[in-house]
Amino acid sequence: GFGLELDDLKALRTWGSKTPGHPEYRHTAGVETTTGPLGQGVGNAVGLAMAGRRLRGLLDPGTHASPFDHHVYAIASDGDIEEGVSGEASSIAGTQNLGNLTLIYDANRISIEGNTDIALSEDVAARYAAYGWHVQVVDWTNGGKEYKEDVQALHKALEAARAETDRPSFIELRTIIAWPAPNAQNTGKAHGSALGEEEVAATKEVLGFDPQQTFEIPPGVLEHTRRLSERGAAAGTAWDEQFQKWRDKNPDGFALLQRLNARQLPDGWADKLPTFDADPKGMATRKASSKVINAIAATVPELWGGSADLAESNNTTIEDAPSFAPRERSTDEWSADPQAGRVLHFGIREHAMGSIMNGITLHSGTRVFGGTFLTFSDYMRPAVRLAALMGLPVTYVWTHDSIGLGEDGPTHQPIEHLAALRAIPGLDVVRPADANEVTACWRAIMEHTDRPAGLALTRQNVPVFPRGEEGFADTTDVHRGGYVLLDAPDLEQGGGQPDVILIGTGSEVQLAVEARRILADDG
């Protein structure tokens, strides 16, 4: 399937193969996300399920049967379950009542250091029940008495999970790692390394295979697995018929779907982007960003986003739009809609926010943004790095980008963060100097579809420069990442060489402008 051949399996974990040790998005056909760091896949799955519900709201709202109804399945290891990001994301999934999500927990209780009893002691199923999930346990170990891989029991649990449409489903599948390898099963060595020739041969003998044969597939097994293509073709034909009926009735929806799939913006989307008059008192770039977000949202229905419980500080709310959540989650401050909602509430879960936004972006052509303080980008860095690795157009709104952030002190003052974020290959980090640069930055970000971007924005007011006047450049070259805002007086007349070049970003640009004036006055 997906173009992989037996030779690709033989080349597992070798240089240049289609089968690396950790599957990579866009490297191997059929791989839907890059999930090397543990726990990320759980967050991605939650994002996929959320995006599925949002896409349904955009294209075919309601509760009737729809070609856009689909189910997300994810498999998690003990390591995934131990990682904090999976707990954060699972809590959000329970709050969201994601009935289109099933998580299968391969509970073999073994990690690289051996039995997980040394580090993992809670009742994981009970934890997921507390998150609000539908929980089932399938015990192939039969309480440790006899190991039997009861496929029918697992299938029954999966069917029950699919029937549970009002909450996500969690299946704890109790297994034995490396079964039936006589020496390696149920050991940490089986988790972290290959079995080796002798153990593979011994395992084949237990299974009744010829230990001298390698990569030998019995004809009956091959015939059985190839029936899957027939089932898939039948399911595809049925879906195509359902989709065609929807398309015939919804030409506008189909046009939107085509645009989303192509990641194209609607015609004229930028016509109403705000421009800001020159003002020495100015405004905070986070406030300017809010105005730009809402201008984009008015013409780009696929834009949605929110904050890690800092909406009022990050200025990330799409005004007059409902929150994306079940209606029963509505509060005095927020009115929720499970399909039409465009305002995301991640809670104080920055890592899950980053991972979920990756899943949202992987699912379909919607554009998502998420906000927090710049200093807390540390909490979401692994997900940001994966977005860059996968080339996903996710947008991060990181505010309070300097010491000018109020009374919170050094714990909230980002010092090393810009340098650390700019060190991530494939991540655009932009720090606009004034309100009009914010508009230009957002425009460039929306026009890019092959990489993530982070906006570093101020809490405090910064001057709005007189663009196109008094020697100040307009914002045409902002998309280049750097440009000459204001030349020395002699250079403006077309002659001479600068004695010094002042470089700044964000709120420091006003200091560079003032320094230029002082130096010019001094000759």
Label each region the model flagged.
Residues 27, 31-227, 427-523:
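Glycine-rich ThDP/TPP pyrophosphate-binding loop and its adjacent helix/strand module
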Residues 1-73, 225-456, 461-463:
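Thiamine diphosphate
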